[in-house]
């Protein structure tokens, strides 16, 4: 018997309709959250005198048994719609409707699912943040070893200026730190309780929303019941944050692919993250980085899908909201899995220092510092110096000479004199790097300072994440062992 349909609609529902509309295939993500939500709600109903002690006790014990049994062992009949009704039906089979039928007093599936989603998502957001923190800490360890390893920096994928490999790695840390901060900020808006908002107008029962908020470990209440059941902006925000993170991770994957090619040859990806060809025996293909780059594209698509589902819905609850969930969880698990892959690749890459230095010294990457030196030593405007050095580069290319062989002729043409040692220093890539010691620059001493600062901040973020996870785990422990 379908306990939901029997009154207004009768028991019958076409099998294909039930399969089309059910959410059970992705409700596994909120099974635990739903049990926690049920227990907290029943505790509150008892404390408020809305249901009897003996009924509350039986319901809570029944919910614990269902939790231990596991969702996979329940009757997942599509005609029951969703996990909420599966659990309630299971409870009614165990305890009878006179007892179990009281669990849903003063509550709707609308506020229930909104609560479940927040409970499930908040933990996933923290897990993602923690995995990013661990990855960044390992990147900092790698950077520590390469503060003086010269590489060329690129703009437009053309040689730009010499930097260090550590400085390049810190660009990843700097970007992904913002991803961590976005996730921690989103957590504030995820961890707000809609429980008690009912279908959309709360309830006439004298429930205590503050109590369920406390029991479930929420930080605040949604203070409008219509907004409480309809709000999915916390999902959009999380999916947007993951899409931005995915863009940053994809950039890392692209550079791993690019720099591991024969033409660049500055790094080598570990064998366990590569494949070979079925026909070309010499091949070592960066398959994991390529697949990660592709999978991360889904995060953008999932976000756009969710935005499109929500864009024209009338206020409060609509069943359309259900269809956001699979896209949310796909984004979440794609992110979790990809972080693991990117972390593994970065942790195990081999560095070709000689090739890095060779590229750093090639193709006029020190031209900017040469122009800066002319400004400092002669007092000419930078734009004038820019033109002079551009002429030096052009002539060097045309005459197939090094810049040092051309610079003095060009300086003489413009009646300029610069000490030879100053010119040599300007053309030395390592001296270029050492001079750039402003905050955020590639100088080894400055990079060391940034490593220290990043470590300190990551330690703070990790402490915050751990405290939140401990609170969540404490909520689970208390509710799943609660006795009246």
From Swiss-Prot:
It catalyses: 2-(N(omega)-L-arginino)succinate = fumarate + L-arginine. One of its GO terms (biological process) is arginine biosynthetic process via ornithine. Its EC number is 4.3.2.1. Keywords: Amino-acid biosynthesis, Arginine biosynthesis, Cytoplasm, Lyase. Gene3D superfamilies: Fumarase/aspartase (C-terminal domain), Fumarase/aspartase (Central domain), Fumarase/aspartase (N-terminal domain). It is found in: Cytoplasm. PANTHER family: ARGININOSUCCINATE LYASE. This is Argininosuccinate lyase. It comes from Methanocaldococcus jannaschii (strain ATCC 43067 / DSM 2661 / JAL-1 / JCM 10045 / NBRC 100440). The gene is argH.
